[in-house]
Amino acid sequence: MRCGWMAGSSETVGIMDTADWYIGHGQVTVAPCVSIERSQIKSPDSGYGVFVDVDKLQEEECEAVELLRVPYGNVISVRTLMDWLSGRGDGYDASKDLIKTYLALFLEDTSNHRFVTETNMLILYLALMAILSERGYGFPDKFVIYLRDVLLQTRLLTPVLEVLTQEAGDAGAHYRNGPQEIFLSTLLQFISGAFMGCTRAVVLRVYAAVLSRCLEIPHETSPGSEDYTVSSSLVPILDFTNHSCEHRNAYFDVDRESGDVLLMLDVAACAGLGDRFEVFISYCPVEELVHFKHTYGFFPRASCGTQFWHMFLSDTWLKEERAPHGSGSLFQIYSELRVLPYIELALISGQVYVNDYCSSFPELLLPFVNIEALSDKESKLTALKGDQQLLAEAKTNFLSFLARYLDKLVANGPIRHSGPVCASLRDILLRELELSKRLRNTLQHGSAFLSSHMADTSPPYCPSPAPSPPYAYMYTSS
């Protein structure tokens, strides 16, 4: 699903007008078989979707059919915005100069350099553009229309937004995104200081909409090269396409000669879908449910493939747990070793397992084995990985801790959720409670480690999560 539904008739007209404008002005090329309508996903957050009418499909014998073509100049990314800012004499010089001035002011504070990622800078660019546009400064229609009718109309609730706008207690604090909270609060402070009377709502909406609508578009590193980098980009019209790893029947690609972004239909994946069907792409190659909630405001539907859940361990409870071979608490040891305490759970066919294939899993085991002769983390990890007896001991001690942790979590779940907690974090905690019950059942009836059930193949790689506020000192980039 694409989060951020457009509620009410005025928003509906606005979105359709936006699509018509981009298509009518040649900003996007659309195949005759394509239409943009309300998604058929049964959810209030499903928004719009891209549909294909098979009767109008002109190249059904091909392996892939081009559904949409968005010219490079109409893709909104840091790269294309910098290209636009570098030009002169198009009637927008005053607006460009102000954008550059405010960008320089933000980056003048060297502590803000840690926020420099493509996505964060895209948020800053577009927040400045939205505010200046409201104050009468001119910008090209392709930017103004997308800002006004898409980004600023997106309604989205995520933990970061709710924490910064509502009362948030300690419940669920270990599932908060520390780096993004720091970035957004810093951005709000900068904007309020730079623009008198600016409302937080504009910045918050731009932040949430950009984060949820960005796609990672590949770009070759040099002409003809097989190597490529990805760029966080907003792709008008193509970004109406909804997400599903399980039902994916299309993908986005780049025309190497023109740089245009393409939505391609995978014809083989459409067999049996009927005469008219909705198009789905994958926003990311793996589904980590906490990340999805933070980014898109929803949990993806259960999949027949592997999904992941990064179970963050409560810093409050870690302070109460003593390490088996030391006097310090688990929280103290993890902090000293700069280990982010989370367990990567693999969700497969309704079962929940501890993913001991995860690259960070050995770090999680360090407090559960006695390696006093070595002081630094890397030496301890090398010793642990190279000694099967040590590894087995660490896993056994870890499982004992995990059993106690799950018992406490299941027993105290309702109490933990009764305090002041925003709706998004409550959703995460309730899902955590459900998965904890299933994991505890797995632990009680056999091995909880994924390697015991998937000995021949390992699951796909899942990127590490961002640290929660108690571990924000570990943050170097978002």
UniProtKB/Swiss-Prot annotation:
SUPFAM superfamilies in the cross-refs: SET domain (SSF82199)
Keywords: Cytoplasm, Methyltransferase, S-adenosyl-L-methionine, Transferase
Gene Ontology molecular-function annotations: [cytochrome c]-lysine N-methyltransferase activity
Chain positions covered by the region annotation SET-like: 199-299
One of the record's GO cellular component terms: cytosol
Keyword Kinase: no
Top enzyme category: transferase
Reactions mediated catalytically: L-lysyl-[cytochrome c] + S-adenosyl-L-methionine = N(6)-methyl-L-lysyl-[cytochrome c] + S-adenosyl-L-homocysteine + H(+)
InterPro entries, sorted: Ctm1 (IPR025815), SET_dom (IPR001214), SET_dom_sf (IPR046341)
Record-stated family: Belongs to the class V-like SAM-binding methyltransferase superfamily.
Function noted in UniProt: Methyltransferase which mediates trimethylation of cytochrome c (CYC1).
Domain notes: The SET-like region, although related with the SET domain is not detected by any prediction method.
Record protein name field: Cytochrome c lysine N-methyltransferase 1
Protein source organism: Eremothecium gossypii (strain ATCC 10895 / CBS 109.51 / FGSC 9923 / NRRL Y-1056)
Lineage, broadest ranks: Eukaryota, Fungi, Dikarya, Ascomycota, Saccharomycotina
Gene (UniProt): CTM1
